[in-house]
Design a protein with these regions (language model features):
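An N-cap/entry alpha-helix motif that binds or orients negatively charged groups
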Residues: 28-69
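Short coil/turn connectors at secondary-structure junctions
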Residues: 73-76, 112-114
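Extended, charged alpha/beta regions that create polyanion-binding interfaces
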Residues: 23-26, 35, 100, 104-114
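Terminal helix/beta-alpha structural elements that buttress the NAD(P)+-binding lobe
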Residues: 11-38
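Glycine- and acidic-residue-enriched helix-capping/strand-helix junction motifs
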Residues: 87-102
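Gly-rich Lys/Arg/Thr-decorated short loops/hinges at beta-loop-alpha junctions or inter-strand turns
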Residues: 41, 81-90, 108-114
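Structural signal for hydrophobic packing residues in well-ordered secondary-structure cores
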Residues: 49, 53, 64, 84, ...
Length: 122
C-alpha cells in the first residue's frame, strides 16, 4: 500500500503526521527493554550481573524449571513477521512491518502482562 500524499485529505494528512511523530518521539519506536530490578548502586549491579548472576545461572543449570523463577522466560513472547501479510498493507517486508509488531507487543504488555522480544531479523 503506497501512500500518495496528494491523495490524502487534510484529516488524513494530520493523522499521518501525528502517527509518524508518535512513532518517532520522544523515544523512537514503541517498545523498550527496561530493568525490573533497581540498578541504583554497585550492590544492585553486582547482583544483576557479575558476580551475582552466576548463582542464578548455576541454579538453572541444576534445575531448568527455575528459569521461570529467575528470568523473564515465563512472561516473554516473541512477535515475528516475514512481512508478507501485515494488517491491510500486504507484502511490505519485515522491516516495514516492524511498527505493527511493536504495536502488538504494546498490546501484549498492556493487557496480558507479557513482554515482547523484538525480532532479531530486521
Amino acid at each position: 500500500m503506497e501512500i500518495n500524499s496528494a491523495a490524502l485529505s487534510p484529516a488524513e494528512q494530520a493523522l499521518r503526521d501525528a502517527a509518524l511523530e508518535y512513532h518517532r518521539s520522544p523515544v523512537r519506536g514503541k517498545i523498550a527493554v527496561t530493568p525490573t530490578k533497581p540498578l541504583s548502586n554497585q550492590r544492585d549491579l553486582s547482583l544483576a550481573y557479575s558476580p551475582g548472576v552466576a548463582y542464578a545461572c548455576l541454579a538453572i543449570e541444576q534445575d531448568p524449571t527455575l528459569a521461570h523463577d529467575y528470568t523473564a522466560r515465563g512472561n516473554l513472547v516473541g512477535v515475528v513477521t516475514n512481512g508478507t501479510a501485515v494488517l491491510g498493507l500486504g507484502d511490505i517486508g519485515p522491516l516495514a512491518g516492524k511498527p505493527v509488531m511493536e504495536g502488538k507487543g504494546c498490546l501484549f504488555q498492556k493487557f496480558c502482562l507479557l513482554y515482547t522480544s523484538p525480532s532479531p531479523r530486521d
